Amino acid sequence: MRQRDTILIVDDMEINRVILDGLFQEEYHLLEAENGEQALLLLRQYHENIAIMLLDVVMPVMDGYKVLQEMGANGLLDEVPVVVITADNSLEGELRAFDLGASDII
């Protein structure tokens, strides 16, 4: 079994990725994606190494909710916990993320 020492950061805003990189770069290997499609490609390739995914909701190409749907359909939520990072603090958004399999929401 491989060591899970990688964080996958998924956010279309570069500044958010830079901030998160700064928080975790000394302790973890980091992978970055700008949208959900890129995230799923990286996840399929490196899922055995990924300790956690930090996932934005609102992104172009494929949003975070669709990523959670795809992960659930492919059994990847059992392997990689997902923390949703979003400015949307609505109850509806939180419930949707949890219903789709998010481990937590920030």
Predicted features and spans:
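Short, conserved "switch-loop" micro-motifs in signal-transduction and mechanochemical regulators
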Residues: 74, 88-89
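Acidic, metal-coordinating helix/loop segments flanking the phosphotransfer/catalytic sites
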Residues: 32-52
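Two-component/phosphorelay signaling modules centered on CheY-like receiver
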Residues: 2-5, 13-32
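Receiver (REC) domain active-site loop signature in two-component systems and cognate sites
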Residues: 59
